[in-house]
């Protein structure tokens, strides 16, 4: 395991330092070769650190540094407004530290559009990549995992964009999931060749021509978690809707299994009974919880950038930091570039 430094936008997300600081400490405790630069309001950061100062070992304390940022990009700001007023914000300063080489990757739970825009401008896409994409690892019902992209970075995509997503997704899956010749599929409204937008059909033909890709054709939304494909490619609109639908469905069913009922007397008994009867199914559904696999990566850039869920808890944000560290150690950007040049 190699030493590395990550830059964290600790003001990003719905809660900010009350989540990101404990999560940062958790990540440092689990990874003795990791150092963190914490970008945000120094008073708030120090206040959160003071709350647990008696639990912070000298080793962990030596591997974190506070970098003050006087401003924060609001989640409700438009991309244009956020970029125009990004100077001095925790998100921008974190990304700039990666550009300067002070850190090898960045993690933020802040405004997704602003993070993508700043990363593209400051860190730059890899040579030949038209658009970076948001990618995440999803659990499948057979106990394995798959990769899905784009999850919201690019609402409108042409055939070339989708083709490049397939290339990047396959390389990402090979390294993150340790797969050989991962199966690639395009998300569509049907499996027939005539179905879907023209861009999807054209992308399908382009992917077929590349023998380096193990293309299996179209996949419909009801099979996303079935383990049929290792890499699922879509435009950002469809991908984002599909992901949130899966998460919401899983959370609702988990709530049912836990016994969420208006009857307070029967609720505990019902919850325990459902967990016993459907133990295996319950555990599989829990794996779809964003807390377990939090962190969508913006791939196609010269450096690692991970977007955490805005509502992520301590464990979830810590997992996003862990994922960013893994990608840096695996040299994902360089491997994508090498794969594109083959």
Swiss-Prot record:
State one molecular function term (GO).
phosphate:acyl-[acyl carrier protein] acyltransferase activity
Q: Which domain of life is it from?
A: Bacteria
The top EC class is: transferase
What are the GO BP annotations of this UniProt entry?
fatty acid biosynthetic process; phospholipid biosynthetic process
> Hey, which pathway is this one from?
Lipid metabolism; phospholipid metabolism
Q: List the keywords (alphabetical).
A: Cytoplasm, Lipid biosynthesis, Lipid metabolism, Phospholipid biosynthesis, Phospholipid metabolism, Transferase
Looking at the keywords, is Transferase present?
yes
What InterPro entries does the annotation carry?
A: FA_synthesis (IPR003664), Phospholipid_synth_PlsX-like (IPR012281)
| Subcellular localization | Cytoplasm
Which reactions appear under catalytic activity for this entry? a fatty acyl-[ACP] + phosphate = an acyl phosphate + holo-[ACP]
Give the E.C. number(s).
2.3.1.274
Where is it found, in Gene Ontology cellular component terms?
Answer: cytoplasm
The UniProt record lists the keyword Transmembrane: no
The record, for HAMAP family, names:
PlsX
Oligomer and partners? Homodimer. Probably interacts with PlsY.
Family in the record? Belongs to the PlsX family.
What job does this protein perform?
Catalyzes the reversible formation of acyl-phosphate (acyl-PO(4)) from acyl-[acyl-carrier-protein] (acyl-ACP). This enzyme utilizes acyl-ACP as fatty acyl donor, but not acyl-CoA.
Protein name stated in the entry: Phosphate acyltransferase
Q: What species is given as this protein's source?
A: Actinobacillus succinogenes (strain ATCC 55618 / DSM 22257 / CCUG 43843 / 130Z)
């Amino acid at each position: 395991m190699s030493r590395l430094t990550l830059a964290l936008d600790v003001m990003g997300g719905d809660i900010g330092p009350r989540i990101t600081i404990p999560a940062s400490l958790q990540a440092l405790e689990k990874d003795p070769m990791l150092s963190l630069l914490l970008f945000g309001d120094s008073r708030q950061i120090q206040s959160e650190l003071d709350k647990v100062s008696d639990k912070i070992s000298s080793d962990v304390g030596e591997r974190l540094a506070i970098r003050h940022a006087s401003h924060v990009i609001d989640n409700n700001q438009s991309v244009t407004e956020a970029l125009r007023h990004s100077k001095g914000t925790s998100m921008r300063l974190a990304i700039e530290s990666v550009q300067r080489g002070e850190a090898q990757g960045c993690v933020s739970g802040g405004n997704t559009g602003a993070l993508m825009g700043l990363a593209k401008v400051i860190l730059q896409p890899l040579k030949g990549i038209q658009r970076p994409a948001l990618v995440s690892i999803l659990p499948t019902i057979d106990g394995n995992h798959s990769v899905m992209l784009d999850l919201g970075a690019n609402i409108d995509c042409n055939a070339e964009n989708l083709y490049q997503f397939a290339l990047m997704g396959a390389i990402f899956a090979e390294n993150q999931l340790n797969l050989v010749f991962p199966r690639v599929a395009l998300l569509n409204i049907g499996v027939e060749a005539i179905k879907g937008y023209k861009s999807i059909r054209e992308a399908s033909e382009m992917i077929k021509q590349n023998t380096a890709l193990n293309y299996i054709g179209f996949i419909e939304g009801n099979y996303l978690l079935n383990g049929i494909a290792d890499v699922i490619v879509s435009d950002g609109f469809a991908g984002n809707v599909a992901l949130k639908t899966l998460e919401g469905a899983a959370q609702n069913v988990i709530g049912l299994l836990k016994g969420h009922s208006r009857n307070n007397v029967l609720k505990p008994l019902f919850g325990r009974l459902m967990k016993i009867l459907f133990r295996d199914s319950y555990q599989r559904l829990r794996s779809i919880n964003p807390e377990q696999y939090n962190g969508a990566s913006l791939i196609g850039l010269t450096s690692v950038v991970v977007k955490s869920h805005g509502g992520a808890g301590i464990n979830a944000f810590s997992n996003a930091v862990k994922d960013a560290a893994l990608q840096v150690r695996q040299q994902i950007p360089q491997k994508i570039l090498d794969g594109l040049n083959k």
